[in-house]
Amino acid sequence: MLRNIYYALSPQLRLFVRKLVYWPVDLFSPKNNRIPPKGLIYTGRGDFLQAGKYWTNKFIEEGGLLPDDKLLDIGSGIGRMAVGLTSYLKTGEYEGFDAVKQGVDWCQINIQSKFPNFQFKYVDLSNDLYKSSGIDASTFAFPYPTDHFNFAISVSVFTHMLPHEINNYLAETARTLKQGGILFATFFIIEKDPINAR
């Protein structure tokens, strides 16, 4: 019931409630500039650093990510993937964009300032989970040149989008990836019989 009430709130109000609820935890937790305050983590759960390491290993082992690749993080959030990648992409480049300004600001201050090969951009996109106004994701052009990246990641992004928005993001990803580039993405699997899909 509380979850239903929470998601009935506007995206801006949900972020405010989250900051308020986690304020005591954030106030008394030891400060670690590799982990954002809990009140700012607007998506994902579990151990922040462990999740970043887990996905970095997946990108390397299953996707073939190389230390000198140019990587695009579609929906970079509050830097969960980026923090895990900082120890691996030593000679590569990382570009991430997201629609939540607080997340991008945190990443610029705590990651980009220490790792100049990691860049974060705020994009004014509309998304019913995070922001009720902005550019329509179905017409959004990624702010990067054609044939620029070797590797793109999109973890838990397409699960928050509508099919016509996903189609545009896939087209933009294809445009910005070099020939032979890799997209490592997560999706929901829709089965004909969801009850017995397991």
What are these regions (language model features)?
Residues 2-62, 78-85, 93-141, 168, ...:
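Class I (Rossmann-like) S-adenosyl-L-methionine-dependent methyltransferase catalytic domain
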Residues 68-77:
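Conserved class I S-adenosyl-L-methionine
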Residues 70, 181-182:
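Short glycine-centered segments of the SAM/dcSAM-binding site in methyltransferase folds
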